[in-house]
Amino acid sequence: MDLQGLKITWLGHATFRVVTPKGTHILIDPWVMGNPACPETEKQVKKVDVMLITHGHFDHIGDAVEIAKKHSPKVVCIPEMGAWLQKKGVKNVAEMNKGGTQHVGDIAVTMVHAVHSCGITDGDQVVYGGEACGYVLKFDNDVTLYHAGDTMAFSDMKIIHELWRPQIAMLPIGDHYTMDPRQAAYAAELLQPKAIIPMHFGTFPVLTGKPSELEKFVEVCDVHEMKPGETWS
């Protein structure tokens, strides 16, 4: 598939850096320092213009506060999480909710549904972080990308296909905390992308799903397996 100047780098687990043809740097689910799958060369984030957070679990919100304070990106998240981030001193929080779209530079960001929990661990407490979500990103070059966040397959993925028609779907496959490869293949049937990037697998022993298993089930599109630190462009 031709990404038309878009660059997608997998930093391990559910963390991605996406660079648009105009040079906008997007960081999705910023967990790098404690992420055992993230290459050492990527643990120091050098630039980020837009940060997207799908939910409040440590392996997704991870380094959001530190990176946001250092680079001052626009931080897109659900309102309850935004309130928590602002209490931690994060500025430029761009709250939104499911179904909403906001334009950030050369990207149209739409927040969509995910089926997962969203508590934020804050010291010895778990703080309500709103609901988990996914994002649809439509770029100026007409490429559309869907990051599902942590989720199981759900029937409204068909709506995501019908309204936005993402060509690329980043789908969790690890099982236990998210869907497994078989469910991810069913999600692909609903979404009808051109390519799936499998994520959220292998980081911990309990995340047993494998891209090779996904390939056995998927019939509607390619499975674009990436290695942590690899860039698809």
Curated annotation (Swiss-Prot):
UniProt KW keywords: Hydrolase
Q: Which GO terms describe its molecular function?
A: hydrolase activity
Residue intervals passing through the bilayer = none
Give the top-rank taxon of the lineage listed in the UniProt record for this protein: Bacteria
Q: Is Hydrolase given among the entry's keywords?
A: yes
- Residue ranges that the Swiss-Prot or TrEMBL entry lists as coiled coil: none
HAMAP family for the chain: UPF0173
Q: Name the family the entry cites.
A: Belongs to the UPF0173 family.
Put simply, this protein is called UPF0173 metal-dependent hydrolase Acid345_3437
Tell me which species this is from: Koribacter versatilis (strain Ellin345)
Q: What is the phylogenetic placement of the source species in the record?
A: Bacteria, Pseudomonadati, Acidobacteriota, Terriglobia, Terriglobales
